Amino acid sequence: MYPSGGVMLGLLAALQVAVQGTGAMPCQPGFTENEYNVMTADVITEGQVLLKVDFVDCGRGSGLRFESGDPADFRIDADGTVMAARTLQLTDRKGQSLEIKAKDENSQEQWMVHINFTQPKQVPVILFPRHSVLVKGDDSVNRVKRDWVIPPVNVLENSRKQFPEELVKIQSDKDKSNTLRYSVTGPGADQNPTGLFIIDPISGLLSVTKPLDREHIPNFHLRAHAVDINGNQMENPIDIIINVIDMNDNRPEFTHQIWNGTVDEGAKPGTFVMTVTSQDKDDPNTANGMLRYKILSQTPESPSSNMFTINNKTGKIITVAAGLDREKVPQYTLIIQATDMEGNPTYGLSNTATAVIRLLDVNDNAPEFTRETFHGEVPENRVNVIVTNLTVTDKDEPGTPAWNAVYRIISGDPTGRFSIPTDPVTNEGLVTVVKPVDFEMNRSFMLTVVADNEVPLASGIHRTRQSTATVSIRVIDVNESPNFDPNPKQIKLEEGLPQWSMLTTFTAHDPDRYMQQTISYSKLYDPANWLEIDPNNGRISTIAVLDRESPYVKNNLYNATFMASDNGVPRASGTGTLQIYLLDINDNAPRVFPQEAEVCERPEPNAINITAVDGDLNPNAGPYAFELPNRPSDIRRNWTLTRISGDHAQLSLKISYLESGIYELPISITDSGNLPMSNTTYLRIKVCQCDHHGDCVDMERIMAAGLGTGAIIAILICIIILLVLVLMFVMWMKRRDKERQAKQLLIDPEDDVRDNILKYDEEGGGEEDQDYDLSQLQQPDTLEPDMIKPVGIRRLDERPMHSEPNYPIRSAAPHPGDIGEFIHEGLKAADTDPTAPPYDSLLVFDYEGSGSTAGSLSSLHSSSSGGDQDYDYLNDWGPRFRKLADMYGGNDD
């Protein structure tokens, strides 16, 4: 069986001891053995005890010390116990021996002994546990498992031996009587990662096939099985734990390659700065993963090369020396090294990182003015104007509270007219006017200013004196605006003040006392246009009657604004407000509200509540007196008016029934003012039929019956406009028809006689004489005798139809287009027509000059003589033509 961990092999008892020298001799200090031989496994774990050497000190006491010849791999205690300082593989060492030295600190004597290491040639054997059989009294048999702890198998990671490497041999005591087959299962065997461990099924040798990596898998849990050739289980499976022993195969790794830290300048020694950390993938419980830190270098090495130190276990960096000054060295750079194997420089692996330490500024430098005196100037009455800039120097870091300057005025400005804010970029002091300065009061200022920082000086920093400066400010005179005093000015007047009444004098004074300027006045704002101001002396008078009830008066106040201007260069002006408080007078008569109301035909359901409204205030308003007029008499007979209060009255029907309709009811109201005013207001009342709720049900009929005068006028105007539009449309249609008919006349240009057509006055005849078809003038050949005058068109004075003499029909014009000839023939026919009007009148025509192509028209003096005509038909025309018949148709008597 193979023990592991910190347990010694049982073979230590077989150490060979060679004792040199014989015989009894005096006490000689030294080791009891000249050489020690130790048989151990190839892999020795950290802390594993190998042996204990014996030394005879001969009473030398505590002055004796043991030393290991290879302290990196082995260490020895004061009692002589030798153990491994780290996990190692003996075959990897240069030698298989170790030298132990004993030294007397007092006499400086030394003694040495060698320890030789050897490894067993056989692999450890792991046996399946045996079982005992316990027989009880009832003949029952119980199998009891013996308590057997199987030690784990240690395998060094990254082994360089030949593979497969035999680890242990698994064996059962039943293989003497049976042929057994061995196998293993679990991760690394038949599970991922498969094939790492294999077992010889006959001999039971368990081997590893390749190097192992503890950082990947630190241990394996396998199960060993033993079966016969038929597959029957011969032993219960046993657990085999394989631990991968760590080797120092990983360097420390810093979590950051560059570390940034800060510390105040002037910090005391021992001030914490920062902590750096690193990690090692090796086993942290062994020296392989135990790290130690140290500072390799510091840049710059000022004022000392060791301004900082680091805790080798925790990585905390602290200051170790005084003299950190940001103004001299603003930043330090440290190279930090982390080494495993507890910092062993020979066997340990190391890595480096950079630590950048920036010194934070503290206020160890006070601001200093660049000059002792600063100059500036400012116009009077100006605010928020920068007069001058104050400059300082400060060696502290810009932009920090230790650098930012704060300026204060300690003298020369008792009224606080100036302030000095700081420019955040340039750190300059901006001397600014915050209250207006007056040239007439102060022509110059002399300020004393001090400068400090936002934070006080650091402790231990002292300065001899505080930096101060003088600021000389000159005030520039400017033309100032005239000022009204008081502004606003209030006066109290009664309303109704007549036109051209003098109200008050509103004047302004000029602040520029040394300029001797003239002030003129003008009106700037007068919404009701009631006032005027004298431009020379500022006297204000009325140009209209003041009315308190005007919409421009708010809360009895009327505001007007006036302007005063001087004659300076440039001109300056100021404004002032005049507030007139108007006292009420009784200048408004009361009136009824509402102006319209509804009431039922019968008095029971409801009544009308009326209110008196007056634009005046008390005592020129209520209480009011309400009264109905005596005339006409039916008003008091039909209605009754009852006063409810000083401002209200109730109107109701006095009779049992009043016909529905709209009534204009006069109501007289008198106010209570001194010299009271009365007014008669007409209340428009709509009397209607009501339902049982007292609501009107025939309001639409009443509204139709009560159409107002304005509505009637509007309706009439609309009707007139509509008629005019219709008439204009008809006239336009007739004119268009006439133009269309005129275009149908085809006139031969050679026979056109339009330039000779003369207009004659016509006396007699009617519209029907001109009613002819123009188309017939163009086609006279188609005229028929019975179509010359249409049937049904007759004159009222035309003679009755009877047999008449036949006249020859006019021949058609030789050419349809010869309108002139057609007209001549028409005239001839008219001359011979006895029915043509006038029958008994002498037609006299004005002389129109010679050369007329129309010739003479027919008349009573025509070429035909009376003797050639037969006038007997006149007797048939009736009594109206009796006289004419006697003149022409009678006999000689």
From Swiss-Prot:
Ca(2+) 2 binds at E157, E215, D246, M247, D249, D282. The chain crosses the membrane at residues 712-732. It is found in: Cell membrane; Cell membrane, Sarcolemma; Cell junction; Cell surface. Residues 25-146 form a propeptide. One of its GO terms (cellular component) is cytoplasm. Glycans are attached at N260, N312, N389, N442, N559, N609, N638, N679. InterPro entries: Cadherin, Cadherin-like_dom, Cadherin-like_sf, Cadherin_CS, Cadherin_pro_dom, Cadherin_Y-type_LIR, Catenin-bd_sf. Residues 777-815, 851-872 are annotated as: Disordered. Expression in the embryo is initially found in all deep cells but later becomes restricted to various epithelial and neuronal tissues. Found in discrete areas of cell-cell adhesion when epiboly is nearly completed. Expressed in adult brain, eyes and trunk. GO terms for biological process: adherens junction organization; auditory receptor cell stereocilium organization; axial mesoderm structural organization; axon guidance; axonal fasciculation; brain development; calcium-dependent cell-cell adhesion via plasma membrane cell adhesion molecules; cardioblast differentiation. Its main location: membrane. One of its GO terms (molecular function) is calcium ion binding. Ca(2+) 1 binds at E157, D213, E215, D249. Residues 148-254, 255-369, 370-484, 485-590, 591-702 form the Cadherin domain. It is a single-pass type I membrane protein. SUPFAM superfamilies: Cadherin-like. Disruption phenotype: Morpholino knockdown results in a disorganized mid- and hind-brain, and enlarged fourth ventricle extending into the midbrain and/or the split tail fin or tail blisters at 24 hpf. The mid- and hind-brain regions continue to show a misfolded appearance at 28 hpf. As development progresses aberrant early brain morphogenesis occurs due to disrupted cell convergence in the lateral neural plate showing an abnormally wide neural plate at the 10 somite stage. Embryos also show defasciculating retinal axons after the optic chiasm and irregular axon branching in the spinal cord motoneurons. Ca(2+) 3 binds at N248, N250, D280, N288, D340. Residues 851-867 have a biased composition (Low complexity). Residues 1-24 form the signal peptide. SMART domains: CA (SM00112), Cadherin_pro (SM01055). Homodimer (via extracellular region). Can also form heterodimers with other cadherins (via extracellular region). Dimerization occurs in trans, i.e. with a cadherin chain from another cell. Interacts with protocadherin pcdh19; the interaction confers robust cell adhesion activity on pcdh19. Interacts with ctnna1, ctnnb1 and jupa. Three calcium ions are usually bound at the interface of each cadherin domain and rigidify the connections, imparting a strong curvature to the full-length ectodomain. Calcium-binding sites are occupied sequentially in the order of site 3, then site 2 and site 1. This is Cadherin-2. It comes from Danio rerio (Zebrafish).
